[in-house]
Amino acid sequence: MTALKHTPLNAAHRALNARMVDFGGWDMPVNYGSQIEEHEAVRTDAGMFDVSHMCVVDFTGSRARAFFEYAIANNVGKLKTPGKALYSCLLNPQGGVIDDLIVYYFTEDFFRVVVNAGTADKDIAWFNQLNEQGGYGLTIAPRRDFAIVAVQGPNAREKVWATVPAARAATSELKPFNAAQVAGTPFGDLTVARTGYTGEDGFEVIVPAVHVEALWNALQQHGVRPCGLGARDTLRLEAGMNLYGQDMDDTVSPLDAGLAWTVDLSTPRAFVGREALERDGTRAAFVGLILQKENGKAGGVLRAHQKVVTPHGEGEITSGTFSPSMQESIAFARVPTAVQVGDTVHVQIRDKQLPARVVKLPFVRNGKVLAA
């Protein structure tokens, strides 16, 4: 049996009596007590997540932009100002999703990418293959000397500034999906990005691994609540954000995973997977579901892999949970394209088919319930 990998905050999690689980080969905290309270902290105040299992990869070289024009499905032409970030899928030639990731542009010869933990080795091998085959001449460097802390919630930015005063000047005017580099802090040189995976405002802070425990402890002293993977999952589901390996993988097109907005077909740019996407088009709708209540009670909880029965054929739930913000059972589902928002479908839960309403994603954004 392979030993679990540890982030630099592993001892800090254990000191907080976190319940630890195997998450894709990493020893990670699922909660530190009440998962519901952790969820609520992010929706109403500020919570923080150790996301150091995710991998920072730096790309340097004069043809970095040309490389990303070909390598990813979204258009790096949108990256014009230093620190601008772009969410995209990395596709295989069949149009399947190798990973979803964020690309940061700093200079024409320096781009930074953050990839998912479970796909990091696969992603880096693919990047190296594309770099070699295309003769781009880039240096591709995984940066395991970095850790990442995501601080999320309506008060997250103020609490980061209280903890790292030098970050205020560099990031107070930062728009969403932009990053700034903050040098010379007590926690080393930081990259602070106004991004996240919760549907709330906040920052994701890339910090030297040797300083991350000091930053974590300082944020806690400024009232930021440690949160685990359990709350991260309910928050991202409410926010309509996909989880790689569950809502899409290398056999699923982004067009069938609610990610058409991340694919740029508006220019003649050649990119990996484009021909397959244009040939196959959209083959399934990706929708939100809310389980209907009978006499004020839901008959179960929506979970991944449950069958969805519609008048147009069957579909499947990809992610499901009980929403603390809505007090409803919610899910994402891949269903036939004829299914429309407002329709009622039926979900197979054990031996029953229970009605669920089809809604537009997201369910919740910036603390407000959007899906009624």
From Swiss-Prot:
InterPro entries: GCS_T (IPR006223), GCS_T_bac (IPR022903), GCST_C (IPR013977), GCV_T_N (IPR006222), GcvT/YgfZ/DmdA (IPR028896), GcvT/YgfZ_C (IPR029043), TrmE/GcvT_dom1 (IPR027266). Pfam families: GCV_T (PF01571), GCV_T_C (PF08669). It is an enzyme of class 2 (transferase). This is Aminomethyltransferase. One of its GO terms (biological process) is glycine decarboxylation via glycine cleavage system. It comes from Burkholderia multivorans (strain ATCC 17616 / 249). One of its GO terms (molecular function) is transaminase activity. The glycine cleavage system catalyzes the degradation of glycine. Keywords: Aminotransferase, Transferase. It comes from the Bacteria. It catalyses: N(6)-[(R)-S(8)-aminomethyldihydrolipoyl]-L-lysyl-[protein] + (6S)-5,6,7,8-tetrahydrofolate = N(6)-[(R)-dihydrolipoyl]-L-lysyl-[protein] + (6R)-5,10-methylene-5,6,7,8-tetrahydrofolate + NH4(+). GO terms for cellular component: cytosol; glycine cleavage complex. Belongs to the GcvT family. The glycine cleavage system is composed of four proteins: P, T, L and H. Its EC number is 2.1.2.10.
